[in-house]
Amino acid sequence: MEFKKFFKKRLWNNNSSLVQLLGLCPILAMTTNTINAIGLGITTTFVLTITNSIISILKNFIPKDIRIPIYMIIVSSTVTCIEMLLHAYQFNLYQSLGVFIPLIVTNCIVVGRADCIAYKSSFVISFLDGMSIGLGSTFAMFVIGSIREILGNGTFLFGANKIFNVLDHSFFFTFIDKNSTIILAMLPSGGFLVLGFVIAFKNYLDLGKKNCLKCFHSCKLKK
């Protein structure tokens, strides 16, 4: 197994958020702030990695006909344990993420990877798949959250002490004056716009400038 290709495929080429467009509800809801985006991304990564690993270990004992309900039991148990840990050790982050922690149970990425990969692959592949898919989703959330926070609030990493307890609550960067911010970026519609621009920029990087211009001109001629 070539680890570079393995991770590149999941982190970039087939990114669950920017290519497959899965799990968009929590992404759009929690990316108004970079720290919340990172927090939800890391939490989702842990859930993906742990559930993939458990299902891979138990795959020979899971009946094929009832595998989906069993996945849901494993995922919900994992999410509940992580939620309790956040409540105990990262209470500020727990409060910020709120209902979106238990909603990870319904995230189609988690059950999708469990059925497509963990149920059919070895422990190592399942573990690495869960981790890489989670990190890819975290990367997308971080980029979208950073753009929305800078444009809509004028700050970057505001509330970093929620994750990094060693930092002071005043640790953050200011890029834009409060009076010059774009409030649209903090609204759901702004979230969709930023997501669209990020996807377009990724496609531009993947396809290259020439292919994008060709596509643009061909669309123009058709009109």
Curated annotation (Swiss-Prot):
Domain of life: Bacteria
Protein name (Swiss-Prot/TrEMBL): Ion-translocating oxidoreductase complex subunit E
Main subcellular location of this protein, as a coarse class: membrane
Matches recorded under PANTHER family: ELECTRON TRANSPORT COMPLEX PROTEIN RNFE, ION-TRANSLOCATING OXIDOREDUCTASE COMPLEX SUBUNIT E
Family to which the UniProt record says this protein belongs: Belongs to the NqrDE/RnfAE family.
Subcellular location: Cell inner membrane
Gene Ontology annotations for the cellular component aspect, listed alphabetically: plasma membrane
Keywords, ordered alphabetically: Cell inner membrane, Cell membrane, Electron transport, Membrane, Translocase, Transmembrane, Transmembrane helix, Transport
Membrane-spanning residues: 17-37, 38-58, 68-88, 91-111, 124-144, 156-176, 181-201
EC annotation from Swiss-Prot or TrEMBL: 7.-.-.-
Function: Part of a membrane-bound complex that couples electron transfer with translocation of ions across the membrane.
Lineage summary: Bacteria, Pseudomonadati, Pseudomonadota, Gammaproteobacteria, Enterobacterales
GO biological process: electron transport chain
InterPro entries found in the cross-reference section: NqrDE/RnfAE, RnfE
Pfam families for this protein: Rnf-Nqr (PF02508)
Name of the gene: rnfE
UniProt KW Cell membrane keyword: yes
Membrane-protein topology: Multi-pass membrane protein
